[in-house]
Amino acid sequence: MYWRRIRQTAVLALVVGAVGAGPAQALTLVPPKPDVLFGVSDQGTTQQFNEFTELLAKHPALLETFHPWGNSLNQAYERWRETGTRPVLAISTMDDQNLSELITPEQIALGAGDDYLLQLNDFFAKRGLPAYVRPLGEPNRCLNAWSAINCDGTQKGGEHTAYWYKEAFRRIAAIVRGGQTLEGLNATLAEIGLPPLNRTKGPNPTELEAAPVSIVWSPLPGGSPRVKGNFPGNFWPGARWVDWAGTDFYSEYPVWKDLKRFYVGKQWKGKPLAITEWAVSGKDEPRFVKQLVAWTVKHPRVRMFVYYAGFGPGTNTYDLRLYPRTTNTLRLKLRRETFLQYAEYNAGLFPPLPPPPPKTAKAK
């Protein structure tokens, strides 16, 4: 079993001591330089994870699970535990069966989804489980329910604007991180113009434990569609609410200038970067793999690299087994030791060592 008791105890000790009146200290969970956390998306079974691992001869450090709003984490937790991976929880507001919208950005911002956010905080805090939480990824992709732009380029308006997306993101970060008394949390929410905690299933907790989570903000590097108001910066919630900046990059849309522009974005220039989804689809693309791995290695702020493996047999165009040359190339590239197979529990949790004392001038 990969869970390491000593490290988990250290995390729990940090979390227990973090509850107070102020907001929880952000945890980046960044690996030591120059390491990159290699990951794969969750296909729903441990067997599929193991098959992916065998295919590439590389154990992924991360397992990214896509969940609709309100979903229980019990089954996902078992997969994370059995595979020895650190979780990446990607949260959607669309039903995964019929794609209907479960909750709007405005409703989240105003507290209609607080029961679920409290559930997430409690889940990760009680277990002392380090995780990356990726709420409402790709807000500038028109097909997502939480986007602000229609596919014809017009504004959705109403409950679906960039303003409400940013407010929803801030509320998610504040509650899921925890580490505050109820009074402190409500003060934080009021500071950004949002109503107090709104638990409907029982009374509000007197305090929220600090959860060892890192919040990932992840738009597309260029808008879909590419129109005014639909670029990454339009959806930036602010550095206070973001621990990682991430983006997705697929062989079907290899717009390298957008990826380069995202990397140098001024608003998130101080954040570690994640490739939260990447994949090959439609045809064998070994050249794309070589380019993307080389780009990742050459850009030191990129510290996470997650392959999107798709869902379902037969119609899954992201299945690497369809692309033997791509698979062979990726297998070779992942031999680099800097692509981590396991996530260390204490990575990014503890403050850096203090700087050495300044040198004093020698007496003459």
Task: Locate the predicted segments by residue.
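Alpha-helical scaffolding within the catalytic cores
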Residues: 43-52, 70-79, 115-120, 200-203, ...
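Substrate-binding cleft of secreted/luminal carbohydrate-active enzymes
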Residues: 27-44, 131, 272-360
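Structural recognition of the beta-strand scaffold that forms the well-ordered cores
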Residues: 37-40, 60-66, 86-91, 131-135, ...
